[in-house]
Amino acid sequence: MSASTSRTLPPEIAESESVMALIERGKADGQIAGDDVRRAFEADQIPPTQWKNVLRSLNQILEEEGVTLMVSAAESPKRARKSVAAKSPVKRTATKTVAAKTTVTRTVAATAAPAVESADAADDAVAAAPAKKTAAKKATAKKAAAKKTTAKKTAAKKSGKQDDEILDGDEAAEEVKAGKGEEEEGEGENKGFVLSDDDEDDAPAQQVAVAGATADPVKDYLKQIGKVPLLNAEQEVELAKRIEAGLFAEDKLANADKLAPKLKRELEIIAEDGRRAKNHLLEANLRLVVSLAKRYTGRGMLFLDLIQEGNLGLIRAVEKFDYTKGYKFSTYATWWIRQAITRAMADQARTIRIPVHMVEVINKLARVQRQMLQDLGREPTPEELAKELDMTPEKVIEVQKYGREPISLHTPLGEDGDSEFGDLIEDSEAVVPADAVSFTLLQEQLHSVLDTLSEREAGVVSMRFGLTDGQPKTLDEIGKVYGVTRERIRQIESKTMSKLRHPSRSQVLRDYLD
């Protein structure tokens, strides 16, 4: 049994009896139904993973023989889902957007005959009339995605027609595709098989979720808070009333011993509504915190840290806002936000913490100093600042010392940064070379003078004044060394010092006393 004597059939077609019989019947009838193709594949037990290749070869043969491949419109989505689930081990769900994923698409489509648009006709799922087969064509993924919107409009006109169809990624999928341009509205829908090169891979497509995060946390935060719309005065009052009612309900629930079940449920609902209103008011004013935090950048705290501290002040403002005063919430919340930020800077911004009240004095002094600099055209003196601030000049100098910012010894200097600030600071513990030389000479002269004395006299003086080990000894300790009384040691010391005071010995040592 041969479908054509002029060509050699592919082995996947020639070895399939049902497919060969289907080709012969198509040559006789001039057309083949899509359901018949699927049944032929199932009858020959062709694996679903090979359906695409077999269908591609079959389509080539049908084109040469002039046979039209028809797709029935009566196939319901539920039946297609059941059939695919039964035969395909790897199931992939495709909707009307599946065309956007197709890289190379070949469609064998048939134009359906005009039908009456009604819900009953669509529900009865009448098969579309056969029409002349169109030429096979290839489209890229962009072209398929561009057709998606037009196909959606056309499908909406057909009442009862469902858009979503369950397609198998490894078999030739049936998909309703719209024609191009204005021909869609006049002639109806085109239906056909969609062959995609994406089906070459039997593995399920990997879905990658892109969260939209960037490397800039500030940008991400601003993008997130910008999604909440701003509130007008009426909306702020409405939210404040709900918050007030929620707080009252929470107080009643906490303090009441026994409540009726119905009343308790109502209070819980009101309390929950108050919490939602509080969150709404907070989220709608997060941008106010950002605008205020920008004024305090570059003062020792990161921008995001300033925002976080300002958010704490915003929460406090929401809890204490009194809508009956008639002011907008932003007017009231600004002061709480600024207070929270400035307090956080006073506690955290400095390496050496300064009390909050002293920070306020330092800031006040800095403001007055800047103002007087503009007025006088020069730096004001401590006396002028003291007169302006009503404090003593000594107090002004002391406050200015407190306000100095510490600087790291490792701060790089110069354009190349090859040296550090610590390299320029004198080491107070380092020995001055001149002093070291002078001390060495003094020791030599002192030993030369002691050499003019007797051994006992030199030893007593050396131990008495610690000339050898730097530890002076008492008369008793020296007496025990020489085995004499402390009085005898005192006499030896007195006699020796008289000898050392003689100009012949003391003159060489007097120069080192200056």
Swiss-Prot record:
* Region (Sigma-70 factor domain-2) residue spans: 281-351
Q: Note down the stretches annotated as region Sigma-70 factor domain-4.
A: 449-502
Instruction: Offer one Pfam family short name for this entry.
Output: Sigma70_r4
Q: Which residues bind DNA?
A: 475-494
- A GO CC term assigned to this protein in UniProt: cytoplasm
Induction of synthesis: Transcription is regulated by the alternative sigma factor ShbA.
Annotated stretches, region: Disordered:
135-205
Keyword Nucleus in annotation: no
Task: Name the Gene Ontology molecular function terms of this record.
Answer: DNA binding; sigma factor activity
- Tell me, how does this one assemble? Interacts transiently with the RNA polymerase catalytic core.
What this protein is called in its record is RNA polymerase principal sigma factor HrdB
Gene name in the database record: hrdB
